[in-house]
């Protein structure tokens, strides 16, 4: 790829960032489509995020992806949020139209699309959702919009717990889905809801390098063959949770599915063109 002065810049702002596959995936897609953009990753944490957004405007970047820990903070620095992004309270995509910033969240649509592509119908189903960060709430919001009956959200009593309660209230007021929030320390409640759940989704970073030997499921007997277990983490590809799920006879969806589908939507938002899906799956080695 020969980058010229006509190329526009798209970024990814997160910390840490060097593990991300998004730059490789998006640049392969852009090159295949013959589009004059290049995608670069920038290590940006909460403290440096405001300055990074000013830089985005000053450099007239086309936009940026947003990942941990900036997804919720980023909502404060855009001019407009989509209805779904408002429901989530977090964004992973910013599009810059001549200095006017629009915030989107493709994490939720990407993850739910990966579930649907596997042949699983979420309508009327119950999801146990682990975590209340940007990715987790995006998945919950999109699932609620697309027909989940119940979401049982579990989170530790940390700085995200109050945000989880606020998220549940927004979803309960704006959709037909019923969301409840429980402390993850309540393992009895966790076991009880898993027994009758249809989907278990890990929306936390537990299982991601360097936490690859950890899982929020402490007892593999809680998993049952009728349960679909889905993962947001893709580094490593096979997390401990997915290993547990496969041992228990569960159907699983790895983090590549969400990465692929959320990235495809981002690509179209930034470029206005279709994402070369099959090509990217092939060159990136994604089975999703």
Swiss-Prot record:
Pfam families assigned to the protein according to its UniProt record, in alphabetical order: SDH_C, Shikimate_dh_N
Keyword Iron-sulfur recorded: no
GO biological process terms held by the UniProt record: amino acid biosynthetic process; aromatic amino acid family biosynthetic process; chorismate biosynthetic process; shikimate metabolic process
Known pathway: Metabolic intermediate biosynthesis; chorismate biosynthesis; chorismate from D-erythrose 4-phosphate and phosphoenolpyruvate: step 4/7
EC number: 1.1.1.282
Annotated NAD(+) binding sites: 132-135, 155-158, 205, 232-235, 255
Binding site for substrate: 71, 107
Domain of life where this protein originates: Bacteria
Gene3D superfamilies the UniProt entry points to: Leucine Dehydrogenase, chain A, domain 1, NAD(P)-binding Rossmann-like Domain
InterPro entries: Aminoacid_DH-like_N_sf, NAD(P)-bd_dom_sf, Quinate/Shikimate_DH, SDH_C, Shikimate_DH-bd_N, Shikimate_DH_fam
Keywords: Amino-acid biosynthesis, Aromatic amino acid biosynthesis, NAD, NADP, Oxidoreductase
Single GO MF annotation: quinate 3-dehydrogenase (NADP+) activity
Catalytic activity, as annotated: L-quinate + NAD(+) = 3-dehydroquinate + NADH + H(+); L-quinate + NADP(+) = 3-dehydroquinate + NADPH + H(+); shikimate + NADP(+) = 3-dehydroshikimate + NADPH + H(+); shikimate + NAD(+) = 3-dehydroshikimate + NADH + H(+)
Subunit organization: Homodimer.
Described function: The actual biological function of YdiB remains unclear, nor is it known whether 3-dehydroshikimate or quinate represents the natural substrate. Catalyzes the reversible NAD-dependent reduction of both 3-dehydroshikimate (DHSA) and 3-dehydroquinate to yield shikimate (SA) and quinate, respectively. It can use both NAD or NADP for catalysis, however it has higher catalytic efficiency with NAD.
Family of the protein in this entry: Belongs to the shikimate dehydrogenase family.
The protein's name: Quinate/shikimate dehydrogenase
